[in-house]
Amino acid sequence: MDIITATLLILAIIPAVSYAWGMRGTTIGGEKGAMLPGAMIGLLIAFFSKILIVQEHFYIFAALGAVSMYLGGSMTYGETLGLSMNQKPAENMKKGLIALFIKGFLWFGLFGAIFTTGINAVCYTYSIIELLIIFALTPGIAVAGYFIFNKPLNVKENKFPKIYFSKTRQESWGALLGALLVLIVFAIIKLNVLTIVFSLSCALFGGIGWVLGQLFQIYSIHYAHNSKSSFCRRFSNKNGVDSWKIMECVLGAFGGLGAAVGFLLTYDNFKLTLFNLEKNDGLLPYNKILALVLFIIWVILLVGDMVHYFIKRPITKKELKKQLKRKQITQEQYAVKRLKAVTAVPRGYEIYDSFTEKIEPVLYCAIPFILICIGSKETALISSFFLLFLVVAQEIGLEKSITKKFNLPFKIVLGVVTLAIFIIQVVFSFDFSVIGTMLLYTFGYELITMVWLGVKTVRLFRKDIKKSTEEHTKKELFKLFINKNKPIITVHAYFTICMILSVLFVI
């Protein structure tokens, strides 16, 4: 790759993935939220590859990126972050930072391994027998890693794993380690330089990025406000800076850079891998009928998964207290809802919730990945666009609420758009183009998020003003609003800059 294109890739991917990781934490979170930065990496790698067959079939790489980043989101890290930042001096700074390096290493390393394994699969570098071996071994070794490294855990009985980076939460990084080992060992056996080098680059930058991001967060919380430099004091969370978001965006920036460096180091290997993709002019299923049948079954399962969003589980008093503490509800709302709240969730709901939670990695990661690997074009198409829209529509339209007045219309609009995207992509095999897909990943996500967040922010501000006995002019109210919501405003101003850059780079 020429130096100009390589430079452009790096300049594009840093702000793009920095934004995407920050948006993950803002809107969706968890495994589904991680699909956005993964898809962003895949999209930009395809676009800047300057290889016609890859650019024409960019959706394959965006889809692989989305499902490859998913599994890392299963790791718990809130209490891990707390080890180094919840107090001054830190409870255990060394352990906290080492833990973040390990978790960042595994998250991005596994992303790189799955992503490049998928590329090898769609390019027929891995045979169907080899893929079956990978699909068979990975879950088993992952489960073994989970039980070896993350069990036993019983807080009440004071039983903890030998290597433990939290206080009370169940960790799962051992499962990711097991899965990563399977893919890397297989790549070593196959002398697959693409997977080995790309994964290592992603892993190192992911680990380092999380440590540096956390150091920025610690500085923002505990040290920036005492700095002699006025510039440094601006980064204090006491001055309205969202220190958590700084950590997320730094991690995203480094993770994106690691993927870019890994791709540049393996560019020649990547080109050699593409022979069969060029020969077949895109994805060619091992068996067209089987691929179609499995795709239809997957879609039916996705529709079935939507049912749990419409089953209203009774809320517990403990959950209500959490909502009140996080200011998600007012004191008045808490008093009213507490009358209907239950002490414990009925057993039937618990079983159903547990089932839907456990089935999601299969529906949103394992099945689409396998289908793409066996050549399902339909799966690649909808996993690059429809699936990314679906997960944000689920979170904003069905998990969160706006106001009683706008809730139903907003849900209907999101539902209609979701269905329309699905029909357009499946019936007409429409890929929405690189620029169209990038617009969804950036301004599409931001627009949907701001509908929810903007209405919520204004509503809370109005309630605060009504409680106040002071009289304010419009100018004073505007200043109060800005000061009260400075973290939100600064974060989304940063997002906007990153989004504009991301779109401009792919025009």
What is each of the regions a protein language model found here?
Residues D2-I507:
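Alpha-helical transmembrane segments of secretory-pathway, organelle, and plasma-membrane proteins
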